Structures are given as C-alpha cells and as structure tokens.
Amino acid sequence: MFRKISFVMLCVMILAGCAASPTPTAQTKNLIGKLAYETAPQFTEGELQQLVASQNEFASAIFAHQAEAKENLVISPYSLYQALSMLYAGAAGETASEMQQAMRLPWEDARVHRLVNALNQRLLNSAGTGDEGSQAFDLQIPNALWADKNGTYEQAFLDILSQNYDTGMKLLDFKDASAAADAINAWVEEQTNQKIQQLADPAMFSADTALALTNAVYFKAAWRYPFNEAATADAPFTILNGEQQSVPTMRLSEMLNASITEELTMVQLPYAGGTMVMEILMPSLDMWNDPAALAEFWASPQGLPELQPENVSLSMPKFRIETLTMDMIPALNANGMRLAFTDDADFSGISGDESLYVSTIAQKAFIDVNEQGTEATAATIAVVTQKMAPGGEPLQITIDRPFIFQIRDTATGAILFIGSVMQP
C-alpha cells in the first residue's frame, strides 16, 4: 500500500468591507454568533477520513507548487486549509464552487465546518495524553476574528464561526491602521510563541476594511527517541548542484519505520506523547533534477512507500527554517481557485455585500529541528477588500542530500506541516 505526500502552521487574516448583523454589547465589544461552540460535533469516521484525504491532496498540490523554487521551505497546509474553510463559509455561487474544487471537498454542503471542528478536537485531545508516562506534545489551533466597530455581518456567517471555530469578532477601528495591526500582531505573536512577528502591516487596513480573520497553529514536541547531542558532528551534505557542504549532523540508532528504494529513502521519527511523527523523505538526485519525474511523484497517490520496522542507524542534519512572506495566490490559482481574487468574486455570505474579493494571501512559517525535538509554527494573511469600483544489521540511513519533511498524525493521517531542506 502507498500513501500520498501531503501538506506547517498558519495564521490567516481576512479583511473585508461588509453589511447586516448583530450589535455588540458595550461590555464585551465583541460580535458573537448565536450558536455555542460545539464540543461534540457529530461525524462518522468515513466522513473524517474523507476530510483528511481532501486536506492531504490539497497539501501535496500546494507544496508541489511552492517547492518548484528548490529552496528551503516550510508551510502549513493544515492551517491554510482551515483558514480557507472559514473563508468558504462566506463564499457563494461560482466562487464557492471553485473553492470547493481547490480544497478537494467531496461535498457541496456545509458539513466541512463541522468536520474541521471534529478533526481539530481529535488532534487537540491526542495532544493532551502521553503514552507510557511520556510528556504529551503541545499543539494549539486558535482562531480569532477582528471586525470593524462600525461594520455589519451576516448572522449565518457568525454562527458558523462560533459553532465550529470557537470564535466571535473582536471590534477594532481599522481607520487607525497602526493600532489595528498592533492588536492583531500581539495576538499572533502570543499564539506562535513569538516566532511569527509583524504579520499585519498597517498598509493592509483602511476605512474600507471590515474584517480580519486569524488562525494559528503551534506545535512543539520532544522526540520519543532523542538524538545524543554529544554525537552531533559536522558531516558532508550534497546540494543539488553537486557541491558538498559541511553541516551539523545528528545521529541516532533505534528501531524506526523506514524504507529504502532506488528513488526514495524514507524514515519516520515518532514524537513523545502520542501519534505525531516527522517523516523524512529523500528523493534521489536524479529525481530532484528531473522536473517531470518530480511532478509525477508529487501528483501520484502512490507517492509514499509502505514503511517497515527496521533497526536503523540514522544520520541527518539539524535544521532551522524561517521563511520570508510567501505569496500563496499563484499556488491557489494553479489549483483552480481563481474567481476569489477577481472582481467577479462572490463573498456575499460574509456581509450580504457582493463587492468583496481576496487581494492577498501570504504565509510566513518557522521550524526548528534539533536533538531534543521540533518546534513549528506558521502564519498566513488573507486580505479581502471592497472592489473599487527489525533484525539483522542496522539499516544505514544517511540524510546527506536535499530532503522533504512532514509532520503528520498517524491516527488520522492529517498533515500539519510540510517542507524541504535544500541546504541546511
């Protein structure tokens, strides 16, 4: 059997000019949906697996597009997908249909919101329990919406967000762009352990801004089998042009799920306290240098081999990646989501106003992998504006050339982060 590669943590801001909703109380200065957060959403395991499959297919496609530059990369398809799900709650007509296609949603109805909630809760609950006394990992998936204090919004939109994403709207005066950016940035920095800073730029806000939507994913976990820090030493790493560089390389001897084929070396590193793993995938240099073969590898549902328990002697570089702001619109365009970024967009479900379109979707991300474990986080901004107008010898696995990594929950299959290391 094979699994498909899929898509590291995200924060999305959606700004919009809007029209028709409840009035906040002076006490809370919040807009709250009428429906309480659903802590026990109804779902079948089949539905949940359909959602995970759609997210993972989306993740593969987005990563394949972003990885074309062949640079160090980390993104969070999980957070991007969740942010798009919240935006989808306000989409209508052909705009909604294109988003459904791009997100690989198998349903036309609104069940995606209930299932996103269910998957979030499944993952968060698994983070709270360690196995055999081990320390549970830290996983946070918070949401926050920020509304212009004079704006009005559709009650149905607010209800979907309160019931499935556990958020209302905090009121801001977007005319004071600097204060609005400061408030949102403070929230983002707190949720990402200060790793994602200055996400919101005052230039994003104006008198026409009505809504900012933020989602963050933060993950931190120790390895189940830590690397021996004393064994870390410089070792050669061959980059794609054939040049060798000396990089700090960690070493571990342990029973691990692994596979070696002519085209791909793969090893799975479990985290302590649950079902989360990091999977390291090292394609052959021939595959890296053959765009057609690499594209087929990303696109194929048979992209990943079945892993087997092996006595592994592993060498791999430690690495830390902090991306610059990445424009995600080209990747979404390439996956069929086009109308949302044009004057023909229809986000009337947000406010009843049809003159809204998405002008920006960008993401920043961070990951640090060392002998003790992993810390990863990401943030994305989407701006919606008004139209202006075992056994035997150890299996030797040496990660000494460009590789791909992904952080995945083995219980659900959900991929939280994916990236590539071209030059540690």
What positions do the PLM features span?
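Non-catalytic interaction/Regulatory regions outside core domains
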Residues: 8, 18, 27-36, 352-355, ...
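Detector for small/aliphatic-rich hydrophobic stretches
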Residues: 2-174
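Feature captures eukaryotic membrane-trafficking machinery centered on endolysosomal pathways
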Residues: 74-96, 268, 393-424
